[in-house]
Amino acid sequence: MSQINQAQYLQQLGHNAKQASYALANLTASQKADLLDAIADALTENTLAILAANAKDVAAAKAEGLNDAMIDRLLLNESRLAGIIGDISDVVRLADPVGEEFGSRVLDNGLRLTRRRVPLGVIGVIYEARPNVTVDIAVLALKTGNAVILRGGKETLESNKLISEVIRGAIASQGLPVDAVQLIDSSDRALVTGLLKLDQYVDMIVPRGGQALQRLCAEQATIPVILGGIGICHLYVDKAANLERALEVIANAKVQRPTVCNALDTLLVDKTIAANFVPQIVEYLHCLGVRFSVCEQSHALLDGLGFDIELATEQSFATEWLSLTLGIKVVSDIDAAIAHIRRHSSGHSEAILTDDIHAATHFMNEVNSAAVYVNASTRFTDGGQFGLGAEVAVSTQKLHARGPMGLEALTTYKWLAWGDYTSRA
């Protein structure tokens, strides 16, 4: 596709999405529920076709030599697809934020002011090898009255094409514009850059991917971008922690799903308890397949014990492992732990384990990440766990949305003012 054709293609996508967004904006909650139910039914009816398309993606990925973790991300089977479809029902049951009015007041001049929650309009989402995202994002966008332009990874192109066509068919069955959901069905990366500059039509960009994608969007976009999804997550074991109970929480944070952004990356251990606890936690996690990148003090405590350890560098502590590797660092006290987190955190999720309420409060006050936990695993940073339903992304920035982005994060508000032929004095 030539540059001229690319520009025309994107302009048409944007124009169609904007027009569709007008029809979506004023749908009732009941109409949106019917739409999502129709999508769930259509996906169920097309299960075999979707799995066949996904099998093509998996075969191509294996032929290209992609690793097992990547293949697992893009794989759909009957159980996984049923779970994705089941999640749509959960979204249907969530309260619809659109139309909510808040902050109402009457001014001295009699003007009645209120704020009403409204859709953003058109959302662009760029993501990698997870076909479930195609469904999740489309459903959340439609629930909030937004049109969406999707650009998935080339690894799931066949899956995404079929899923999006099924969704568009369900939209048409409800008498709504099919361009409420559009997929960029080309792997040409120039189209990503073009989408990032489509500010005439697109109101927000959400990149769901690694650091390279996040940086590209931050540097190239002329549209507001929600950055996030990169987790360099920390857990600090305070000297007043219950060490026996700490073991299970740390294992949960690291081992349950090590390839996700809310998995634990660096364990910080207070020096007061390090001599006993570092060997204890390493032995506990070693049995679960964890490898270790540790500071010099930790290395000295573990040397000769037969564990899979390497000496960490400063870069190690700035790494999102996305694997069964864990960084371990001994720190002098809670303030040293906080300083380390400030230096290396991506702003995603941090935790402290302690039975000292003063230490817990100090940690929560001083650590400024999207989610801060006391005596809990970092794995809870998730839209479903927070009661938000499926999530669009996990934002690590501070403007507009922060943390797991549910339905409300896909809305804005407008001021409504009622007067009695009122003029400004």
UniProtKB/Swiss-Prot annotation:
GO terms for biological process: L-proline biosynthetic process. Its EC number is 1.2.1.41. It catalyses: L-glutamate 5-semialdehyde + phosphate + NADP(+) = L-glutamyl 5-phosphate + NADPH + H(+). PROSITE patterns: PROA. It is found in: Cytoplasm. It holds the Pfam family Aldedh. GO terms for molecular function: glutamate-5-semialdehyde dehydrogenase activity; NADP binding. Keywords: Amino-acid biosynthesis, Cytoplasm, NADP, Oxidoreductase, Proline biosynthesis. It comes from the Bacteria. GO terms for cellular component: cytoplasm. InterPro entries: Ald_DH/histidinol_DH (IPR016161), Ald_DH_C (IPR016163), Ald_DH_N (IPR016162), Aldehyde_DH_dom (IPR015590), G-glutamylP_reductase_CS (IPR020593), Glu-5-SA_DH (IPR012134), GPR_dom (IPR000965). Its main location: cytoplasm. The keyword Lipid metabolism does not apply. Pathway: Amino-acid biosynthesis; L-proline biosynthesis; L-glutamate 5-semialdehyde from L-glutamate: step 2/2. PANTHER family: DELTA-1-PYRROLINE-5-CARBOXYLATE SYNTHASE (PTHR11063:SF8), GLUTAMATE SEMIALDEHYDE DEHYDROGENASE (PTHR11063). Catalyzes the NADPH-dependent reduction of L-glutamate 5-phosphate into L-glutamate 5-semialdehyde and phosphate. The product spontaneously undergoes cyclization to form 1-pyrroline-5-carboxylate. Belongs to the gamma-glutamyl phosphate reductase family. This is Gamma-glutamyl phosphate reductase.
